[in-house]
């Protein structure tokens, strides 16, 4: 922090559709680059772990599980970074699929923020795949140990 300000950075990694491992590697690389530049808050695009354009692949259990595995990997491989990091992924909760931002800090998954306003016009079909987080009551906490199974 300098003069009461912190540096924030927005990153747009190269992603491959449904290649969560490649995408996570790019995110991790960019986190370390942003750290070198002094960023303390790092924001990545929605669904950056899977890529936004997965379409019907969002309904594949393998994709959803791999996204969680790579989220844990990102948290673990950035544990030494002193920053608040936000990455996007699809997350199933109580039988519904949400487009969420995951907050990470010092190797921990702090929580998830589900997208509320889902566009459903022109080329955007988010409402076909995702549920709005508007009606979720309270905080949804999913411990990282769930992802180790």
Question: Where on the chain are the PLM-derived regions?
Answer:
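Enzyme catalytic cores with a strong preference for nitrogen-chemistry domains
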Residues: 1-149
